[in-house]
Amino acid sequence: MKMTTEEAFVKTLQMHGIDNAFGIIGSAFMPISDLFPKAGITFWDCAHEGSGGMMADGYTRASGKMSMMIAQNGPGITNFVTAVKTAYWNHTPLLLITPQAANRTIGQGGFQETEQMALFKDMVAYQEEVRDPVRIAEVLNRVIMNAKRLSAPAQINIPRDVWTQVVDIELPVPVEFERPAGGADAIAEAAKLLSEAKFPVILNGAGVVIGGAIPASMALAERLDAPVCVGYQHNDAFPGSHRLFAGPLGYNGSKAAMELISKADVVLALGTRLNPFSTLPGYGLDYWPKQAKIIQVDINPNRIGLTKKVTIGIVADAKKAAESILAKLSPNAGNAGRDERKNLISTTKSRWAQELSSMDHEDDDPGTTWNQRARASKPDWMSPRMAWRAIQSALPKNAIISSDIGNNCAIGNAYPTFEEGRKYLAPGLFGPCGYGLPSIIGAKIACRDVPVVGFAGDGAFGIAVTELTAIGRKEWPPITIVVFRNYQWGAEKRNSTLWYNDNFVGTELDPEVSYADLAKACGLQGVKARTQDELRDALAKAVEDQMKHGKTTLIEAMINQELGEPFRRDAMKKPVEVAGISASDMRPQLLA
C-alpha cells in the first residue's frame, strides 16, 4: 500500500494506541506532528524537554498506557537524558522518538547534530535507527514492542530526510507475548520453602504494581499470615489499610517493616530487583535478614541475585508467580507460629504508628546542633514532619501523589499509604531533582477524574519551575503542587553539618523569591501556608478547586530548616587535611 513515511509512522502509533506526546516542537519532526491532530494524538508542548520526559513517565506510571517523548534533534534530544534514565529505573515503558540530522550531512558536525544512539545506549532497553524509509513502520513497531516487553524506554532514531517520501509499505501487525509464569521446578521449590517457613515475609516491589499483582500478593499473604513490606518509594504496592501491611523499607521508611523483615526465615521478594539503596540500615537497624532464604521473582533474569544472595530465582511476571506459588502451598502452610506471628505484626505496627505520630522533629548526631538551632531560629514554623501530618489529614484517599528527591520529601516516606497501585509517583532510584511537578502533570493528563497532588522541596522545584509558564493554558488540566519552602538544599546541608563542620557551600536559596507569587504571575493560584491548620485548609481548598473549578494551585508550605537523616551515611566520611589548601596558591589565568 502506498503512503508517505510520516503516514506510515503515525498509523503505527495508532495501531498501538499511543495518543499522547510530550516535548517541544521542532522542524525535524514537523511532518509527523502535522498529522497528530488528524490522528487523535495530543502534543503536550512543555517548557523544557526534560520536564516533558518526566510528564511522560508520570502519564504512563499513573495509567499503564504508553506515551512518547519527542523533540528537535541535538539540543532538544539531549535535554531528555535525565528523564529517560529516570524512566529506565522506574521500569516505565516509553517511546523515545529522536529525530536526527539528515543522512547526507551526518558526520560533518552540522547544525544540531550529536550521536543520539550512543547518547542513550545505557539508558534504554532497546534502540534502533531507521536505515531505509520502507522499513519505518517495521522499526517503529519493533521499538514499541520492546518497550512493552522489557518495561522500559525504547528509542527510535530517525534521520530527518526519511520523512516526506512515498513508499510502498505493509503495516506490521503487533505480536503480543504472554508474560512468563516461572519455571515449574522453581515455583514448586518456592512453595515448599514458604510452606515450611516459621516467619515468612513478602516484599513487594514495582513489578507488583506494574503487573497488577496486588490482589495475588494479598491472597498469598493472607494464606500465610505473612507481613507484607514494600520497597523504597513503592508505598502503593499493597493496600495501606490491610492488617498485614507493614510499610516501606529503606530511607525514612517504616520501622515496623524493618523490625518484621529482620525476623524472617523466608523472604519472597516479589517483582523487585532488590536495589541495595532500598535495604540500607534505617533508624539504627541493620534489618536485612542475612540468614533468611530469599526467593526473588523478577521478570528480568539479569537482576536476579545481582544485589542479594538468593536461594531461589524465578523469572516471571509477579502476578503469575504469586498465583502459582499460592496454588502449590501445602495444606499446613503458614500454620507454624501463625498466632504468635499475627500478634507480633499487630503490636509492632501499633507501636510504630504511635511512635511516628509523636515524631515532631529531626535528631542531631552527637557533636552537631543544627536541628536544635533551626528550631530555635524559627520557633513558630512547622517542622517537615508537622507539615506531613497536616497533609495526610487533608489528602483525598483516592489521590495520586508525586514526590521529589530531597530532604523534605524523603522525611515523608513513611506517611502516605494507598489502597491501590499506580498512586505513588516517586522519582525512583536514579534520583532526579525536578520530578515532582512534571510527573504529577502527566498523571493528571492520564487520570482526569482523580485528584492529584505533587510534592517538592524548594531546591528540586526550582529545576522544573519553568513548567508554571506552560500549564496555565486552557488545554492543560488543573493540578495541585505543594512546595516545602525552607530556602536550602537540605540533604546536602545535612552532609555539611555531619562531615564538613557547617561549611555550607552552595546550600542556600534566595529567601526573597516567592514561588506562590511566581505561580500567580503565571495565571495560577498561589498560597502560602505557615501553620498546620493553614496547610491542611489550603490543601483541602486546592483539591476542591482542582476537581470542581478546574484551577491549578501552588501551595508554599513554610517550614523550618530541620534536616533529616543523610541519604548516604554509608558513602560519606570526614575529610582529612594532608597538604592543605590556601587561597594564596591561586594563580591568574593566562588568556590567549
Where are these regions (language model features)?
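Active-site diphosphate/adenylate-binding microenvironment
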Residues: E6-F9, Q14, I24-S27, I32-P37, ...
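Thiamine diphosphate
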Residues: I97, T105-G107, F111-Q112, I261, ...
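N-terminal alpha/beta PP-like core and its mobile active-site loop of ThDP/TPP-dependent enzymes
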Residues: M1-N332, T369-W370, A394, W476-I481, ...
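Hydrophobic, well-ordered secondary-structure segments
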Residues: S278, G282-L285, I325-K342, T347-A353, ...
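Active-site nucleophile and cofactor-binding loops and adjacent substrate-binding regions
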Residues: I24-G26, W44-M54, M69-G76, R131-D132, ...
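Phosphate/pyrophosphate-binding active-site segments
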Residues: T5, V134, N157, E170, ...
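A general structural motif
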Residues: K2, H48, Q108-G110, F177-A191, ...
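Generic recognition of flexible, low-complexity loop/linker segments
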Residues: I144, E189-A191, K255-A257, Y283, ...
